[in-house]
């Protein structure tokens, strides 16, 4: 019989992307979830993730603390910015880079993804973006 479950904190290991830390809360290992992943993402001030996408998984996120800027599109030339209290959606198969543009405030995001926490890192795609994203985040 299936029963509701409580997970205290997001501490489970899950797929990672350089520049940020993901911790699983709700997934197949913690509660036997088959069609949803929930977790917490944190990033230090003035940092960026590597380029990645989430395959067939869509991502919905809530910004708990700080600011997250998501670069996407041709040459990662476009971005959206979400602040504490905002919700964010990233469609399936969209390559992106997450940036914490703040020079002094960490970023914390709660995310839900389905059907699973698919992470496809794109290590060759971000070299040129890192310099541009960090320059943009510091006002340059």
What is each PLM-predicted segment?
Residues 56, 75, 94-95, 115:
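A generic "binding-loop/recognition-motif" signal
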Residues 30-31, 56, 75, 103-104:
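Short strand-connecting beta-turns/loops that link adjacent beta-strands
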Residues 43-44, 82-102, 113-114:
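Conserved metal-binding segment of the jelly-roll/cupin
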Residues 22-24, 39-55, 92:
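Conserved short histidine dyad/triad with adjacent acidic residue
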Residues 38-41, 60, 89, 104-122:
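A short hydrophobic beta-strand segment most commonly corresponding to one strand
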Residues 1-35, 50-51, 124-140:
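A short, N-terminal "cap"/entry segment at the start of jelly-roll beta-barrel domains
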């Amino acid at each position: 019989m299936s029963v509701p479950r409580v997970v205290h904190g997001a501490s489970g290991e899950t797929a990672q992307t350089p520049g940020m830390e993901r911790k699983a809360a709700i997934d197949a290992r913690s509660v036997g979830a088959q069609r949803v992943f929930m977790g917490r993402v944190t990033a230090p001030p003035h940092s960026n993730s590597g380029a990645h996408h989430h395959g067939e998984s869509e991502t919905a996120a809530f910004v708990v603390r700080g600011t997250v800027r998501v670069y996407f599109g041709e040459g990662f030339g476009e971005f959206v910015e979400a602040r504490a209290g905002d919700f964010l959606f990233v469609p399936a198969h969209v390559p992106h880079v997450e940036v914490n543009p703040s020079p002094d405030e960490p970023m914390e995001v709660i995310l839900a993804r389905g059907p699973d926490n698919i992470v496809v890192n794109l290590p060759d795609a971000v070299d040129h973006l890192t310099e541009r994203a960090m320059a943009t985040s510091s006002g340059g």
